[in-house]
Amino acid sequence: MLNIGIFFGSKSVEHEISIITAQQVLSSIDRKKYNVIPIYISKSGEWFTGKVLEDLETFKDFDKLEKKAKKIDSFSVKNNKLLLKYGLKKQTIDFCFLVFHGTNGEDGTFQGMCEIFGIPYSGCNHFSSAFTMDKVVTKLLLKEKEISVVDFEYTTEINEEFFKRCEKNLGYPMIVKPARLGSSIGVSKVVDRKNFEEAVKNVLLFDNKVLVEKWINAREINCAVMGYKNIFVSELEEINKKNDFFNFEEKYFKKGKKFSNHIIPARIDENLKNKIKEIAKDTFKILECSGNVRIDFLIADKIYVNEINTIPGALSFYIWQKSGFTFSQIIDNMINMGLERFKDKKIVSIDTNILKIKVGK
């Protein structure tokens, strides 16, 4: 039986969202197939494990969490396995199932560690995770491949020239957002210069790279894509938004309306549905994704790819359920795809005695 480590939390403004997704995974994973080990990374970077981490109430008081959970003192790697040490005990991890959202987890950092240590893991590889985390890099690449994206500007240097360039090239209203965050955190719609400057200040609380997009009156359609060698595309989800865009409050703080904003299948004709699915598959391939990804679209005069989520909230299970997959099947597929990718890795070292060769001056 495989020892599956469920990794979540980490130093991210989406920390709490990661905890929620992890609880859903922990309650849905098939424990007849896997030995499940929850591993929580705190906002300060400390690692914890223990059964207590499977209770959402544990995370409401960090002082109690520290006392109840087992703090991991150190870890090492042997034979493509992660060895965790806490007190006098050790725990072997055969596979890292990643449920991070945002920076220091979803962005290729943890994936890179797994690559260096030679440990199999779920989701996109370190390369794909890193550049899809940056909305600007993603848009530039998709645009190069003739995938439609909304007109945009970006900067890491806030000055008058940037404000004027956006006003000239995009015009009001505009959408201002952090380039490397998800969950709609820090996103604002601006209608004048005062709004614009305030929105940029807000973004700078979260990220030093600002993305500004032309606002368009569009329908929001989402699509989940899962695969490694064989690619599956889900039913389409329509967001029934109350505001001009689906913001953080609507996503997570509408009591009693957990998924009432999600209309599945989307209310669109078959021809448009097929076009969106084809673009979703193309985007997945262009960005070299693997695992389970959600691609968000804006539908107006064109089909625009808006954002890519390489570890989507709740693993997009609510979309996949409408496509015939249970939550546990989604988890199984992600584990199997991660293991298959690990087996397919190319040889990265060769035997050589080059260091024994004498090199003349």
Swiss-Prot record:
EC numbers, comma separated: 6.3.2.4
Binding-site positions, ATP: 167-222
Binding site for Mg(2+) 1: 296, 307
Keywords: ATP-binding, Cell shape, Cell wall biogenesis/degradation, Cytoplasm, Ligase, Magnesium, Manganese, Metal-binding, Nucleotide-binding, Peptidoglycan synthesis
Main location, first listed in the record: cytoplasm
Any one Gene Ontology cellular component term annotated for this protein: cytosol
Top-rank taxon: Bacteria
PANTHER family, alphabetized: D-ALANINE--D-ALANINE LIGASE, D-ALANINE--D-ALANINE LIGASE A
Cited function: Cell wall formation.
Family classification: Belongs to the D-alanine--D-alanine ligase family.
Full protein name: D-alanine--D-alanine ligase
Organism: Thermosipho melanesiensis (strain DSM 12029 / CIP 104789 / BI429)
Taxonomic lineage from the root: Bacteria, Thermotogati, Thermotogota, Thermotogae, Thermotogales
